[in-house]
Amino acid sequence: MDKNYDRIIFPERSYDFVAPREQFVENMVSYFPKEEKAIISYMDLLDQVATNSRSYFTNKALPGILGTITYPFMTRKFFSYSDRTTFDVLSGLTSDQHLIGVLTGQWGDHGLPPKQSSFAMHAMVARHYLDGGNYPTGSSRSIAETISDLIESHDGVLMVNAGVDEIKIHNGTAVSVIMENGDEIEADTIISNAGVVNTIDRMLKNGNGHSRLIDRLEKVEQTKSYVCLHIGLNKSADELGITNTNLWIYPSYDHDKNVQDYTNNPEADFPVVYVSFPSAKDQAWDENHAGYATMEAITLSTWDWYTKWQDLSWKNRGQEYEDAKTKLSDRILDIVFEQVPGIRHAMAYKELSTPLTVRDLANYQKGEMYGISHTPDRFRQRWLRPKSDIKNLFYT
């Protein structure tokens, strides 16, 4: 991607996040010249989190007694960062609320505003961008295609449109997977990448320690949902002057207040509108789609706003639902047109996905954005590790 990977936009001005690391620091200091010391300290903290996260995550892979014995000293330093919120840590570096608002302008990448998110999560996301953003040639589908080739080359078998109904447990051991059509596939090792909530709540039936696992789910919370406006354009990105810089558009620097105001009143300003340009990021796009471009505009949402339609099937939710989508789409477009005015007369297609869409197509039951929220408490849950409490069952 371009070196300017993100642009953080507020009503009166914008701030560019530019790679490499040295340029990022130079830009931040130019925006906030009185805060150079705080900015340098912030960069150092990002590195400290990265360093200490290695032993924390390594411990999650250690078996049994070895993991238990080493747990205290392999996690202690990481917890000194993960136990604190992002806002708490940054407030210890600076009192400049605008600087804090800018540095946390990517909060949508992990789903929680700074007063709720673990600083460790913020740091891992922010630091990984410092050398620039990357995008797979051929779009995200090329990742799946590459992985599938590798699996099949080792005699693996891939099944699509094959829903799982249950992971069968016998005497405390995962022994097979029962498909929605009734087929049973036996296996010595079962790995679920459906997320712990889906795995425990939907695939493990009563008994076999299920109640204990359900109790553990009460110690974590699911992330909020989102809506995404998918836009198709009948001109190329070059013709429209579109770059591949992501846009983060905010009504104010106080992200937590923005989220709270919108959650309380869906007619309030959007807490964030994230605009990205997938086709402009894909180096292979023009090979098959010359003269066209795509965009996405995403904002926060809540499952509760859509429960009245939850029992209606996809594409058959009625006129009220379609009218609500149209109204929301128009509001999002008003924000998008302010920042990317050139696309107004090139729109050939638009479609809004809602939390119900996420449930139906991605199987997140409340349309979650990222599964489990990245709060400080989340990182204290020792049971969130690859090896589950059930023999032969693993989580990704």
Question: What does each model-identified segment do?
Answer:
Residues D165-H289:
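Mid-domain catalytic core of redox enzymes
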Residues S55-L62, E152-L158, H170, D238-E239, ...:
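Surface-exposed helix-capping loop/turn segments at secondary-structure junctions
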Residues D96-H110, F270-Y274, L333-T396:
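A glycine-rich dinucleotide-binding beta-alpha-beta segment and adjacent secondary-structure elements
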